[in-house]
């Protein structure tokens, strides 16, 4: 199980990374997260929508109401230029953390 702290820290870059390829609505984002994480990250509506609203208020996303292919009215989110810049910054930071941890964790020492 992944800690709530790590999930919270990774939410923004994950959402921005998903939306960089095009607009999506909340349920699609939740399903995409589940898919890319192999089911280890299971987001809920209650977790996602407040984050989307904060990101929109912060200028990282814009939204619009649109009828989906299924004929339902849904709120679609799209990344802004500011969101792209934020994603670039987040990506650099996470890559640095990943690089440092990779060096520390490979190979794992045996416990004797």
Explain the meaning of each model-derived region.
Residues 48-55:
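Basic amphipathic alpha-helical segments that dock to polyanions
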Residues 3-47:
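N-terminal helix-turn-helix DNA-binding core of bacterial DNA-binding proteins
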Residues 59:
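Glycine-centered, phosphate/nucleic-acid-interacting loop/turn motifs that mediate DNA/RNA or nucleotide
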Residues 63:
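Short beta-strand "wing" residues that participate in macromolecule-binding interfaces
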Residues 85-112:
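Amphipathic alpha-helical dimerization/coiled-coil segments
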Residues 69-91:
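Basic, amphipathic "hinge/linker" alpha-helix immediately C-terminal to the N-terminal HTH DNA-binding motif
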Residues 33, 53, 68-69:
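Short secondary-structure boundary/capping segments
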């Amino acid at each position: 199980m992944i800690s709530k702290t790590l999930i919270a820290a990774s939410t923004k870059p994950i959402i921005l990374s998903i939306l960089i390829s095009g607009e999506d609505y909340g349920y699609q984002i939740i399903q995409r997260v589940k898919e890319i994480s192999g089911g280890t990250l299971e987001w809920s509506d209650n977790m996602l929508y407040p984050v989307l609203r904060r990101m929109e208020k912060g200028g990282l996303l814009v939204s619009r109401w649109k009828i989906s292919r299924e004929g339902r009215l849904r709120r679609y989110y799209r990344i802004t230029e500011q969101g792209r810049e934020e994603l670039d910054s987040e990506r650099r930071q996470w890559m640095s953390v990943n690089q440092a941890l990779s060096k520390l964790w490979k190979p794992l020492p045996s416990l004797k």
